[in-house]
Amino acid sequence: MSSEKPTSLNAMRATNPCETPIQLLHEFGTKTGNHPVYTLEKAEGQAHNPSFTFRLVIGDITSLGEGPSKKTPKQKAAEFALNILRGDTSKCLPVTDTLRDPKKPPNQMQENPVGSLQELAVQKGWRLPEYTVAQESGPPHKREFTITCRVETFVETGSGTSKQVAKRVAAEKLLTKFKTISTDNIPLNKLIGNKMGCTWDSMRNSSGEKISMLKRSPLSIPNTDYVKMLKDVAEELDFNLTYLDIDELSVNGQYQCLAELSTNPITVCHGTGISCGNAHNDAAHNALQYLKIMCIKK
């Protein structure tokens, strides 16, 4: 009699009929070398009635799941992936209430990514996470917020129907990123270097050519390469400049990005455009306008 463990999904289901879709898919991934990866795509709704969407990737298969807790959409996505692996894409079995944690109400959040990220920062000796509202859009009854979360040199964005939701999504993305890298071996302080010392006072007192030109420039000339102009200012004042593209299009269907300046305090400006390059130029333009205001302001 063979002692070989079953590798087919039907055999695994027959061997362990009480396993949840997540458990079964994890077992299948372990035996085939394709481990499932779950990513939080969206979190919206109010705190008392949240809605989460998770993306699952296992090998070449991608599926989505949605639900009122973080566990339910993962189960749905896993169930759908299992159906694809079985060769039956016509059905996605419903996730029953037995899959939910009986100790928690369905609408109660199972995790606090904002608190978890702060705890991680304290454990590692990093500066606490910094959250910045990058954009507010949409009508008053359907607002959409985009928030950036920065921990040392790492930045992620989150979008949601409230600032709290967007903040949670951004924190969740950073936590996911930290799980894929070895945070113990990252020389974060060395990565930051000495480029965090560009303060508003040092900008106002600077007599450099580029910053002096910025102070007297109208910043309203059509077809100006604001990306190059901001790059020149950054090099002269010795601060880092990073463009972060946002995956989601704006409410008007345009590309979005953020321009992050490692000034002290950090500056983050939003930009939109019909192309990625135009969005960068718009973000650079907004950043230059902000720098100009702060340089003149006493």
Swiss-Prot record:
Keyword Zinc set for record = no
Question: Origin, by domain of life?
Answer: Eukaryota
Give the keywords, sorted.
Answer: Cytoplasm, Nucleus, Repeat, RNA-binding, RNA-mediated gene silencing
Q: Where in the cell is it found?
A: Cytoplasm, Perinuclear region; Nucleus; Nucleus, Nucleolus
Distribution of this protein across tissues and organs: Expressed in brain, heart, kidney, liver, nerve and spleen.
User: CDD domains given for it?
Assistant: DSRM_PRKRA_rpt1, DSRM_PRKRA_rpt2, DSRM_PRKRA_rpt3
SUPFAM superfamilies associated with the record = dsRNA-binding domain-like (SSF54768)
Free-text function comment from the UniProt entry: Activates eif2ak2/pkr in the absence of double-stranded RNA (dsRNA), leading to phosphorylation of eif2s1/efi2-alpha and inhibition of translation and induction of apoptosis. Required for siRNA production by dicer1 and for subsequent siRNA-mediated post-transcriptional gene silencing. Does not seem to be required for processing of pre-miRNA to miRNA by dicer1.
Family statement drawn from the similarity comment of this UniProt entry: Belongs to the PRKRA family.
Q: What is this protein called?
A: Interferon-inducible double-stranded RNA-dependent protein kinase activator A homolog B
Tell me what gene encodes this.
Answer: prkra-b
